[in-house]
Amino acid sequence: MVFSMWTRKRQILIFLNMLLVSRVFGFRWFPKTLPCEVKVNIPEAHVIVDCTDKHLTEIPEGIPTNTTNLTLTINHIPSISPDSFRRLNHLEEIDLRCNCVPVLLGSKANVCTKRLQIRPGSFSGLSDLKALYLDGNQLLEIPQDLPSSLHLLSLEANNIFSITKENLTELVNIETLYLGQNCYYRNPCNVSYSIEKDAFLVMRNLKVLSLKDNNVTAVPTTLPPNLLELYLYNNIIKKIQENDFNNLNELQVLDLSGNCPRCYNVPYPCTPCENNSPLQIHDNAFNSLTELKVLRLHSNSLQHVPPTWFKNMRNLQELDLSQNYLAREIEEAKFLHFLPNLVELDFSFNYELQVYHASITLPHSLSSLENLKILRVKGYVFKELKNSSLSVLHKLPRLEVLDLGTNFIKIADLNIFKHFENLKLIDLSVNKISPSEESREVGFCPNAQTSVDRHGPQVLEALHYFRYDEYARSCRFKNKEPPSFLPLNADCHIYGQTLDLSRNNIFFIKPSDFQHLSFLKCLNLSGNTIGQTLNGSELWPLRELRYLDFSNNRLDLLYSTAFEELQSLEVLDLSSNSHYFQAEGITHMLNFTKKLRLLDKLMMNDNDISTSASRTMESDSLRILEFRGNHLDVLWRAGDNRYLDFFKNLFNLEVLDISRNSLNSLPPEVFEGMPPNLKNLSLAKNGLKSFFWDRLQLLKHLEILDLSHNQLTKVPERLANCSKSLTTLILKHNQIRQLTKYFLEDALQLRYLDISSNKIQVIQKTSFPENVLNNLEMLVLHHNRFLCNCDAVWFVWWVNHTDVTIPYLATDVTCVGPGAHKGQSVISLDLYTCELDLTNLILFSVSISSVLFLMVVMTTSHLFFWDMWYIYYFWKAKIKGYQHLQSMESCYDAFIVYDTKNSAVTEWVLQELVAKLEDPREKHFNLCLEERDWLPGQPVLENLSQSIQLSKKTVFVMTQKYAKTESFKMAFYLSHQRLLDEKVDVIILIFLEKPLQKSKFLQLRKRLCRSSVLEWPANPQAHPYFWQCLKNALTTDNHVAYSQMFKETV
């Protein structure tokens, strides 16, 4: 434990150092050409590489070697081999889902016919691998040679039809195994799904096993005793035997749903058991499940629930009995007495066919469930909801959610909920509740009698219950087996106690309906037909209401006092109330917001508002206004100045969304009428063809401007001259062809720029100053029409070196031309294919001239060298006269020149070379050494010159490194000078390393005088021959050893 904690801390430090170094030195630790997103999760010490849906046909190069999580889902990778992850030794999770999805499950536009091939040992070298997802690849068998570190293996939606002991023997350390969806109607196997007896017994560490959607006919025998979760739903199991779960004492989750299903009205192929018989469960089948917490028996055609099933389930917390035939059983439910710790209970969609109950009868046994928090009874189908129906729930102090949706309730006295102030959600959605003036004492009641069969299909709206596999994992998300669903409008629910009356037949509301519901914080009335004229009195009992969803109704805003009774209201949704706004001659007062002192957010989307009796909206508190899908083009029509200040008196407004208002152009005067504190302005999807950029100066606090999905063709000359506060500019999906010369000059505050999906061909350097670009956090460029010519070289260079995040850089920022570069990624262009400026042209001309000059000189030298040489020296002698060169008498046989700083070379010279050549027992040579024979205090150059002059030969002991030093070059030049002055060749070269193959001098030297170029042999047996060659070279004049061809030429 201590070691693992230390390792984790060390990994975090490594990540921090890696990020710090990349920032300081300005380089990336993965290539820009990598077509994946790379993220670092420092607390978890994870490097996450996501290559989802990148059209890959192989695992890309450049994946960081320290990657821990690699996602390659939704691609077309045909095969995996041991080399696929060769350098990725730190991988902990690999997600290879959906690279060859089965035909009926996959896209019809790209049918995969060749299954993913996984070669043996492909994953065996990944010693840290913990999770492997291989779903949706048409695999025929479980991969072999998996690493022992693997804890999770997912093989869903493949073609694995047979489970045997043999193919599970390597999975002894697996804790989670998903084998579902390998044999069902959307992935048919056409054979019987077989599981060998006791096949899973070898997997002693197995905790989660899923065999869902497989046409399994019986519970597998002898499952591992440590199993915690078992999913067997949507199979064809007809019987649960007494001993099926005998040894599963630790099991916590059991799902047997969809075995012998109730098939009435389901939207998928469904085959019930014979005569609609239920799943037969032995009375003692669950006796061993003492630790069970979740039991799902959804859609098992159950008609009776014996109490004996639950006699040992004292810890059960969630029980799902939905979509069975338990309408009568629900009235008694004696089995609930055995479940004192139950937290969630679902009785939904147990209605009897052709039966419409007068009211609902809940069992008295419910009162024993003191810990119950969630009760769902959708689809019971009854007419009236009254106090006596719910009286049994008064004794449940912890009850938080009561779901009575989709019950065709016609009469509902909402005031019965005054006894349930602890409820957080009361769901009466998708019913037939409607008001009646004649029955005020009841509250809501019917306006017509309707048969239940006529509306039966409405049950399908509850998709949670009528999906074949509600827990199925998609290709994009690997999370599965989620907890129970949340309310549809989660935004409303978070404010507190919620009453959901959405999608009913309510067309009139009055205070008495909510008289005792003052505790409500959120009220959802969306999807009704409320068309009354609100005057500010209808909802006065709801003094604490903070969220009101009034969308999808027929709101008539005749009075400016509408909703004024809701003084605590913070969020108001009036979207999709276009009925009266589309009619002619109706008065609309949109200044009702003035009296809502705490209103923070107002949604008035998709109302087709084109007229208003009030010239302005007013509010001191409103911060967010959504006004999408209206007709500001009519209110701001040219020549009509009445509504130019329509939003001006929203003094606290920060976010204004006026997208989809058909604004082909925006009147310049509108900017003067904008709210003074506006920070976020959205004008998307308006069809704007022009925009008065200079008017942005009037919006002093504007930070975000969204002009996406319009028809703009131009950007401002200088964005900084238009706005000093703008940090985010979104211009995607327009018709912009070019950026102005100084577009971003001085726009240092900009952090996010999106110019994707335009028609930009060239980005000039002056348009994107580097100091501005380096301040950006996000630059979105994909789907433009870049011309990758010489004008783009600077941009390509910047893109390759910047740390700014550019989404889809490797895949979608591509060239449309010239032809050779069409479709090529911008970052992969060769920066050296273009001449940048006149300087390069001049340099090119000079270099060509130099080459031509050298060619002429060399040719002339080759043909007329000796003639020119003779003429030159003849006339030189004529003019200066002849002088005899004085030469000093030699004191040494050889001067040894070597790298005195290299200890290995020094050792070789002193112990090998000196020892051999100055050995008195053999022919004795007098050598001159720098460290031994030079005069102390005398200048180095003078010592060097004297040593060369006083020696018959100069021996250079060569290494690759020493050949590049200045001391070598100086000694060599002085030795070579003797050849020019005295016509004496004194140079001998000894190479201790492999000689420079490309050296022209060395090649020429070998041609002229091969005996003066020696190599120290690696074979010790060749050493005597080397010493003999060296002694011969020291005693022989180099001129004598010159090549015969050279002598004849001379």
Swiss-Prot record:
Native source organism of the sequence: Mus musculus (Mouse)
LRR repeat locations: 42-64, 65-87, 89-111, 126-149, 151-170, 171-195, 203-226, 228-247, 248-273, 275-289, 290-312, 314-337, 339-364, 369-392, 396-419, 421-443, 493-516, 517-542, 543-565, 567-589, 596-619, 620-645, 650-673, 675-698, 699-722, 724-746, 747-770, 773-796
Tagged with keyword Transferase: no
Extracellular side: 27-837
Assembly mode: Homodimer. Interacts with MYD88 via their respective TIR domains. Interacts with UNC93B1. Interacts with SMPDL3B.
Protein name (record): Toll-like receptor 7
Cited InterPro entries: Cys-rich_flank_reg_C, Leu-rich_rpt, Leu-rich_rpt_typical-subtyp, LRR_12, LRR_dom_sf, TIR_dom, Toll_tir_struct_dom_sf
GO biological process: canonical NF-kappaB signal transduction; cellular response to mechanical stimulus; cellular response to virus; defense response to virus; inflammatory response; innate immune response; JNK cascade; MAPK cascade
Glycosylation sites: N66, N69, N167, N190, N215, N387, N524, N535, N591, N680, N721, N800
TIR domain sequence ranges: 890-1034
Family: Belongs to the Toll-like receptor family.
GO cellular component, one term: receptor complex
Record's keyword terms, sorted: Cytoplasmic vesicle, Endoplasmic reticulum, Endosome, Glycoprotein, Immunity, Inflammatory response, Innate immunity, Leucine-rich repeat, Lysosome, Membrane, Receptor, Repeat, Signal, Transmembrane, Transmembrane helix
Subcellular localization: Endosome membrane; Endoplasmic reticulum membrane; Lysosome; Cytoplasmic vesicle, Phagosome
Entry's transmembrane regions: 838-858
Positions on the Cytoplasmic side per record topology: 859-1050
Ways its activity is controlled: Activated by guanosine analogs including deoxyguanosine, 7-thia-8-oxoguanosine or 7-deazaguanosine in a RNA-independent manner.
